[in-house]
Amino acid sequence: MAGRRDSESAQSDIAPLLAGYRPLPGIFDEMMDRDGRVRSHWQPLLAMFAALGPKQLSARFAAADRHVHDSGVFYRVYEETTGAERPWPLSHVPLLIDASEWQMLKAGLAQRAELLEAVLADAYGAARLVREGRVPATVIAGNPEFLRPLVGVAPAGGVHLRFYAVDVGRSPTGHWWVLGDRTQAPSGAGYALENRLALSRAMPDVYRELRVERLAPFFQDVQAELSGLNRQDDSRVCVLTPGPLNET
């Protein structure tokens, strides 16, 4: 009963903050359930927003925007020929994913990465998928990105797919869908880091109280992975970009 009373109290505290908010029909709403109640893992964040009040909340959001601007975070659109920079649109309210749901999603994405690694290793190795008729040879050999000189070449550490990103989204029923795989030039990690820096500095109390999962372990793992490929102790690892006119 106590848990139910606490939930009802939280719903009451944040009600003024959400006045006029209505979920879109036919679309899964991250914040509200079907009954129009705020999901439990969103309640602490919205309660803190409500406690800050509109004036203080606007000031915090403005501070986050200044951080993004001062850091020089921009992006470009491929279709535009001018190459003009656009300010990075910071979302002041982050997407919240419950810890248990994140563990499920993380396990599924790790499994997908292992599958893509196996496919890539086979394409440049034994080619069983082609020989067994599971994948037409033209799909691989006819792909302009297929690097024939690398067939039979063992990569350092035995791993082909070192860095992998994936676009995910919700189905209308709330299930996670994979919308796209990013294996050639995965981008987004830098934007995620800048988003986190901007919001955590503008609202340090919010991030501290909510015990948000840290991003540092990811970047530490990337650094360790790249450094592990280095056979010399005194050399440095450099990450090259496509250049200043690239979208990201």
Q: For the regions a protein language model found, what residue spans apply to each?
A:
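Preference for protein termini
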Residues: 1-248
